Structures are given as C-alpha cells and as structure tokens.
C-alpha cells in the first residue's frame, strides 16, 4: 500500500489508479489494461503500476483476469464505493454545503452526558453562547458507515466553542457545538446542537446532541428509531 494517508482500505496512490480505471469504463464492465500503458498515464514505472493494481485487487476494489497481452479489469462495488466517497469529499470542498444531513438510529448512552452537561463550568457557557440551558442528558445517535465518513464534515462547519475550565479537583476539556435540527418520524425540533468534545471516548460512529428539552419525549423517540440530524453550515 502506498501513500502516507489512506482512504478505506487503499492509499491515495491506489485511488488515483482506481479513478483512471473508472474513467476507462471499468466501473461499468471489463476493460483491458496493460501495465505499460497504465504506467505511462501515471508517470510511474511498470512495477509501480503493477503493485498498485495488486493492492486494489487485494482490497477487493477490482477483479482481474490476466491474459498474455494484459489484463481484464472490473471495478467492484467496494471500488465504486471508495470513488463515491472521494466524490462526496470534493463536493463538500467545492459546493456550498448549505447543511449536512446525517441519518442514524437512536441509542442509549452511558449516562455521562447528564453529568457533564450539568456541571457549572459547561452549563454557564451553554446559557451564554447557545442561549439556553440544556436538558441534563444527550440524545445519542448511532451512525452507519456512510454517516461516519460524513460526520467528519461537521468539523469543517462553523461551530460555537465551549472552552475548557477547571475546578479544585480537575480540568474539564473543551468542545464545539454545531446548530442542528433533529428530524424524527413526522416531526422535528429546530434549536438543538451536536456537541463534539475535543477529547472523547466516542468513536466516529456516534453523535451526541443537546437541546433545551428532552428530545426523546418531544419527538417520541425510542431506541433504534431512525432520525436525521441536519447540521447547519
């Protein structure tokens, strides 16, 4: 695998090869490829082109049928999915985002949100900067794989900084809040915020949302209910 940073199971160098293959039509069906021709288009050696094709094959991004004068290559569903992710990234760069919508399912948290949100150092800032004191607890939303990648786009939007603070016992970390609307089944609540601590044990597969009301009650939500979170740009 090449490239200092990777997307999915392959590096950016392999994604460049995948893009060339798709431009040749390999995402629709088999195309015939020679390593020499591919190397010329990549401005790389034949060995490098062959190595990148092998990496794509190993990651199940392409299927290959080797013949005497080249190889027949098809981009797989996984390969198309990787290219679609790249496309969505570029859309976020060059288009006005308007808002970022993430779909997920309601889940029960571990109760930590209730404790931290009620702490005076945070609560005071919420009132001053968000204009309300949050209900003591967070709405936790699990995100599917596609939503996890889109979640990274939230931090490119304008947010409200919640500063770190300390008391006699410890220091409490900073966070950023992003205005959002929570959409349930036939009803919604405008005036909530996604809260992302700068340091958190949560993975990218979950969102925490605060609001001046108990969102579960306001929207009639239960665990495993589907919701959409519309984060404002």
Swiss-Prot record:
UniProt: Mg(2+) binding residues: 138, 140
Chain segments carrying region Unknown: 1-99
Residue stretches spanning the membrane: none
Pathway: Cofactor biosynthesis; FMN biosynthesis; FMN from riboflavin (CTP route): step 1/1
Region feature Riboflavin kinase, mapped onto this chain: 100-233
Binding sites annotated in the UniProt record for CDP: 109-114, 213-216
Coiled coil: none
Gene encoding the protein: ribK
Function: Catalyzes the CTP-dependent phosphorylation of riboflavin (vitamin B2) to form flavin mononucleotide (FMN).
The organism of origin for this protein: Halobacterium salinarum (strain ATCC 700922 / JCM 11081 / NRC-1) (Halobacterium halobium)
Similarity field: Belongs to the archaeal riboflavin kinase family.
A GO MF term: nucleotide binding
EC number: 2.7.1.161
PANTHER family: RIBOFLAVIN KINASE
Protein name: Riboflavin kinase
Reaction catalysed by this enzyme: riboflavin + CTP = CDP + FMN + H(+)
Domain of life: Archaea
Swiss-Prot/TrEMBL cofactor(s): Mg(2+)
InterPro entries assigned: RibK_CTP-dep, Riboflavin_kinase_CTP-dep, Riboflavin_kinase_dom_sf, WH-like_DNA-bd_sf, WH_DNA-bd_sf
Pfam family, one: CTP-dep_RFKase
């Amino acid at each position: 695998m090449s490239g200092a940073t990777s997307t999915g199971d392959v590096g950016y160098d392999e994604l460049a090869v995948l893009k060339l293959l798709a431009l040749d039509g390999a995402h629709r069906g088999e195309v015939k490829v020679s390593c020499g021709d591919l190397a010329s288009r990549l401005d790389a050696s034949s060995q490098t082109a062959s190595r990148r094709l092998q990496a794509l094959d190993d990651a199940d991004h392409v299927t290959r049928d080797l013949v005497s004068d080249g190889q027949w290559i098809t981009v797989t569903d996984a390969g198309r999915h990787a290219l679609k992710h790249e496309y969505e990234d570029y859309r976020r760069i060059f288009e006005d985002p308007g808002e970022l919508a993430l779909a997920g399912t309601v889940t029960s948290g571990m109760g930590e949100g209730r404790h931290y949100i009620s702490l005076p150092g945070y609560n005071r800032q919420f009132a001053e900067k968000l204009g309300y004191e949050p209900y003591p607890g967070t709405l936790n939303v699990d995100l599917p794989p596609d939503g996890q990648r889109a979640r990274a786009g939230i931090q490119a939007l304008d947010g409200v900084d919640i500063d770190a603070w300390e008391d006699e016992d410890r220091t409490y970390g900073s966070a950023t809040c992003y205005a959002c609307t929570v959409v349930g089944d036939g009803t919604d609540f405008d005036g909530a915020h996604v809260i992302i601590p700068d340091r958190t044990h949560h993975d990218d597969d979950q969102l925490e949302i605060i609001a001046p009301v108990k969102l579960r009650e306001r929207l009639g939500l239960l665990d495993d209910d589907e919701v959409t979170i519309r984060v404002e740009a």
